[in-house]
Regions:
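Extended, charge-rich alpha-helical interface modules
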Residues: 2-234
């Protein structure tokens, strides 16, 4: 074994140290997520493409939820995806419904929460400096400015660096434990410690996607794919 590889137990220990410093309730016996060797890292191009697709869907979902989605909006989104990034065929089934304007109002509202999963992808790409304590929504203006900044996939690729998988796994372990805290608080009325469950859940979803390459639910064209329907048990 490579002695430089951090074990799942070590990640758990680091997370618990953080939770203790933040006065966030936790349980010692919550299982691990992954050992490093269990995970196939996603490449930078794949993460960028997912970020671009998610961004376009979120923008359309925001318009739908306000009752303002137009044919011009749809054409603009499709051109953004096909002409600027060539990723139109990489949309998930739910994203396809959003951009087609056929998703329900409730579905569109849920789709807007993907902002937090997208925030995680931009963190993984080094654009977002850190994943701060999940009690406030992400900087939506920064996301929009970022997506407006790049001229296309090559430009995006040239100006970003994917974080090491060890760093991503550490963030996943911490948010997994945050998620347990929020679920326990919702069910049993225990201390929430200032956490926002929706933010925690969506950020964890983004981190889970970064770590589930090659798994059964990794095919984005499937209706139960890991982006639209992440497995978030605690």
């Amino acid at each position: 074994m490579n002695n430089n590889v951090i074990t799942a137990q070590e990640r758990k220990n680091r997370s618990i140290t953080i939770l203790q410093a933040q006065n966030v309730p936790y349980i010692e016996h919550l299982p691990f997520r992954y050992e490093t060797e269990e995970v196939t890292p996603r490449d930078k191009k794949e993460v960028i493409e997912r970020a671009v697709c998610s961004f376009a869907s979120i923008m359309c979902a925001l318009s739908i939820s306000k009752g303002e989605y137009s044919q011009e909006d749809r054409v603009y989104a499709e051109d953004f995806l096909s002409e600027k990034y060539n990723v139109l065929e990489l949309l998930t089934p739910m994203e396809q419904q959003v951009i087609a304007g056929t998703i329900s109002e409730a579905g569109a509202m849920n789709a807007t929460w993907k902002y937090e999963s997208l925030w995680v992808l931009l963190w993984a790409l080094g654009i977002v400096e850190e994943l701060s304590f999940p009690n406030e929504i992400c900087d939506c203006d920064l996301i929009m400015d970022t997506m407006d900044e790049f001229e296309g996939l090559d430009d995006f690729m040239a100006h970003t660096t994917l974080r090491p998988i060890e760093e991503i796994l550490q963030a996943l372990d911490l948010h997994y434990r945050y998620h347990w805290t929020t679920v326990n608080a919702r069910i049993y009325g225990s201390d929430l410690a200032g956490l926002d469950e929706d933010i925690v859940m969506e950020r964890r979803a983004g981190l889970e996607w970064l770590c589930c390459k090659g798994q059964e639910n990794d095919n984005l064209t499937d209706s139960d794919n890991a982006w639209d329907h992440p497995e978030l048990g605690t």
